[in-house]
Amino acid sequence: MSKNKHELGSPFTVPLLLNTLDVPAFAVDADGAVVAWDDQIAALLETAPEDAIGVTDIGERLNDDGSRALANKVADTPIDAHHEYDGVGLADESYALLTGDYVYEDTTVAGNTDLWFIATPVYHTGEFRGVIEIVQDRSSSARYQSELQALFGELVDTLDAYDAGRFDATVDIAAEDTLLDDEYIQIGRNLTEFGDTLAAHITEVHNDVERLEAASQAVSESSAEIDELSTAQSTNVSTVATEVETLSATVQEIASTADEVVDTSATAERLADDGSAAASDAADMMADVATAADSVTSDVEALQNRIEDIDEVVDVITGIAEQTNMLALNASIEAARAGEEGEGFAVVAEEVKALAEDAQSNAGHIESLVSEIQRDTADTVTDLVTTTDRIEDAVAQVEDAMASFEEIVTAVEATAEGIEQVSDATNEQAASAEEIAAMVDETADLADDITTAVADIVSQTEAQSAMLHDLDESVSELHDQ
């Protein structure tokens, strides 16, 4: 047994001993049952001694999470508790109120409370008799003050390093074995993270500034080009405006001409209708002439037939005259034979002969006239046939002319309709051209405004580029300090 081991005497002396320490404390026996519960621990944990004495699971009774008390863990393994249980460590005796070969601390609550739980095993005549556990205020302990002062020193050194531009500096502290509150430890961590973040931001800002400078230069060059293009565009728009005005005037002139063409087309359509009507009348008249020619031809043919009948009658008369002449000759011959008795008969025969000769002569003359009439009639028939053919050709030509007139009328009507549509479209185009001219004028004004705005952008871009250059130099100086 080490001489530093606490020797626990009669259990009846333990409460008196704990009350003399003037710190919250309690003791458990070797079985883990509470054998002493001083007034300070009773007030701190709001648990009267009579409610705690004899309890073997005091931690499970008092802790919200049901965890065991440090004294019970040490009672299980007095000389090896820091190896058996997570969250149990050896306390630094230079800051702890208890001393001994084994002074344990509960590290699981070190960062969550201002209380410091410390326990040490107690022996009597070399035999393990129990454990004393005290609750120490960490904020008033020398260790706490030392760790807090060390943390403040780390914070100041780190801030000085940041001020010098060394953003890789960190706050070094053993967070896993300290009495400091988690809030203090988090301050150190936050400062280290701030340094890392600030270094990253400075690098990023430096890179961004370089990119912005390059982009600003590109924007400046592009703005200058845009300025030139805007000026050229403004000039072009002005030219277009002039050309559109000319176009508008031309379209209006075309619209006026189209209106005149519409009137002319209407006149042509009317004349074509009149021509078609006249051709129709001519066709009717030619048809009447053709009918009349056919009638004349028929009459001439009938006359020719009658003349042929007359010719036959003349032939008969000529025959009769010849026979009469023969009879008169025979009568003269007989009268000559008869002598004086036949002289009267001879005279009659001579008269008959003369009459027959006259009849025969007249019949010949008639026959000659009939022949001439037949020739004239034949010529007339031929001429009438030719005339009829020509009339038929003329009728056909007139009918063709009527068909052509009808086609002309249809074409003129279609042309008139198309020209009316063209006139309407041209009038609409004239109105549209006027609107376009107005819009182009507005565009020209906008182009002038854009040119002015681009010039302002160029000026602002140059100023921004200068500001970015100054910012880059400032960031570089901050990084190089």
Swiss-Prot record:
The record's section on SUPFAM superfamilies has: Methyl-accepting chemotaxis protein (MCP) signaling domain
Chief site of localization = cytoplasm
Residue ranges of every copy of the PAS domain listed in the record: 10-81
The record's listing under InterPro entries reads: Chemotax_Me-accpt_rcpt (IPR004090), MCPsignal_dom (IPR004089), PAS (IPR000014)
Record GO biological process: chemotaxis; signal transduction
Methyl-accepting transducer domain boundaries: 208-444
Q: Which cellular component terms (GO) are annotated to the entry?
A: cytoplasm; membrane
Key word Protein transport present:
no
Q: Source organism's superkingdom?
A: Archaea
State the Gene Ontology terms under molecular function: transmembrane signaling receptor activity
Q: Which UniProt keywords apply?
A: Chemotaxis, Cytoplasm, Transducer
Query: Cellular location of this protein?
Result: Cytoplasm
Q: Could you tell me what this protein does? A: Potentially involved in chemo- or phototactic signal transduction.
User: What is the similarity comment for this entry?
Assistant: Belongs to the methyl-accepting chemotaxis (MCP) protein family.
Q: PANTHER family, alphabetically?
A: LYSOZYME-LIKE PROTEIN-RELATED (PTHR32089:SF112), METHYL-ACCEPTING CHEMOTAXIS PROTEIN MCPB (PTHR32089)
What is the protein's given name?
A: Halobacterial transducer protein 9
Species name: Halobacterium salinarum (strain ATCC 700922 / JCM 11081 / NRC-1)
The encoding gene is htr9
